[in-house]
Amino acid sequence: MQADRLCNARRLYATERMVLIMKYLVLIPDGMADEPIAELGGKTPMQAADKPTMDKLAAMSRVGTVLNVPAGMVPESDTANMAILSFDPKVYSKGRSPLEAVSMGIDMKPGDVAVRCNTVTLSDEIPGQPYEERVMLDHSADEISTEEADALIKTLNENLADESRHFYTGVSYRHCLIWNGADDSYDFARPHNIIGQKIGEYLPDKKLAGGYRKLMEEGTKLLEHHPVNEARRARGLKPANAIWLWSAGKKPALPSFRNKFGLNATVVSAVDLIKGIGLCAGMNVVNVEGATGNIHTNFKGKADAAIDAFKNGSDLVYVHVEAPDECGHRAETENKVLSIELIDKKILAPVLEYLESCGDDFGVMVLPDHPTPVRLRTHTSAPVPYFMYSSQKKADGVSCFTEATAEAKNAFMPDGSKLMQSFIDYCEK
């Protein structure tokens, strides 16, 4: 009721002033920010990419940098996107896995702990070699298909599930373990942070988290020669021959986005984590067919979903695209550049064209959540570039939207959780 009154009040205020209701597009190319890369002639992927729509808007926008990951926190997408959506991660972050579980429709009960379960690729098993000596080769097992991964998850449940724990299939390599009564305080190593390294020093501590460690080793034994993996090897693909557990947490609770801003908001994303944040914040969540969370995602489908959300009454649409992040993790420089170009051409351009055709005032904000440098193949906590565009005003922006041009504007926001309010205020005042 409070949210309805706030939404109605906004519309009444607009009517009395004879102005149109604002529409807001927030576009998140996950992990887009990077470092200069020799392969690109010393340019970053943002500098190398042909992105005319971003650059056109940035030239008329407020431009700056923002820190989405608070000091002392791990630079994960849950932390950064929570901040962008105005929720202070220092207060509300309970780990990414519970958010993913919510998105997957899992009914978490008291005492349940959600744990991310990656299907990963470890170096081939060598007779007599300790499990600890194996090397993390790929956190995504060559971006295994959901269908193949589902068969692996079923095998895990048949052999390792019991009354207290159960595995749930997610998308591609991203899955979930629900374990009632498990410890949620242990800080796990992230598989994407240890590519090329022996896993021994990164496994859960035997004394502090021995149950998790035992489950990981048992799961690996089950998957090593699974028919799915033998078939993948025969096709020249990496096997998903192990599981890696991380980011344990209990069910989160977020304030209502609608209560906070008086806006009916929709999330468009392929990633359970982002959809989970939206659901916990009372936002509408759209599932896009063919949205994979990588370079092969349905870019056009995401644009269509955003446009449909506006047509169906959404005031704000939050479009998250995972592709640049995955390319960073996989050290795929050319694909990272391509992903930025596809986001610009197939998502931002058509949604902007729709908004311009409607006659309503609107705002557009574009920023990555965190950097995912190709060189490092993992996230960093560095500030990221942003621009805020309002159809009602023309600011002195930048000719090309990049890390360097944004930093040169000397408009740094130290707290990403204040960014959304700043964007709305900028567009409406």
Show the residue positions of the predicted features.
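Feature captures the catalytic ectodomains and active-site-proximal regions of enzymes
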Residues: T15-K429
